[in-house]
């Protein structure tokens, strides 16, 4: 899903950078009240785990690549603000250190993976968790990765610098990730269900509406 440099027109890349900068800035502002000695270790553990999972990539014809994303899981476990920051760290390190995704295109990758994936996943989980928590986690994981792929497909499809037309990018990128999203949804649901049962104090969505503060000890 990472967009290399040369795939986006300057205007499209600039719009992605603007959207990413505004959202990440708001996340930093809100995270100040959440990030402390209890949540900092968890933030690092989640980011490291997702970083490792994202290193597995499968090429997609007519697009970039398909891989596990993990933003929905980060949003559910850490909350939207810390989830955005965790995924921002993952995507930025991948681009700057490992060359996974371009530097100019970093704004697009951040918007798709660190913004859309986290916020859509978190929002859908909140919407459906009263019906069935594990099912809500599955829906969040599947829909978040599919919609993130759609954002990437639209970005490169609207760019004249990219060789394929928007119909091709949307069909192949979104379709490929919709299939992969089934696996991501299942993993998100499975890991969430286990953690929520074993260590509910780790899960942001378990205490966000209560007056209790999380007591996180890793």
Curated annotation (Swiss-Prot):
Membrane topology, as annotated: Multi-pass membrane protein
A single GO BP: transition metal ion transport
Function: May be involved in metal transport.
Keyword Transmembrane: yes
Subcellular location: Cell membrane
Transmembrane segments: 7-27, 42-62, 73-93, 101-121, 138-158, 178-198
Top-level lineage group: Archaea
The UniProt record lists the keyword NADP: no
Name the record gives this protein: Putative metal transport protein HQ_3621A
GO cellular component: plasma membrane
Originating species: Haloquadratum walsbyi (strain DSM 16790 / HBSQ001)
Family: Belongs to the CbiM family. NikM subfamily.
Swiss-Prot/TrEMBL keywords: Cell membrane, Membrane, Transmembrane, Transmembrane helix, Transport
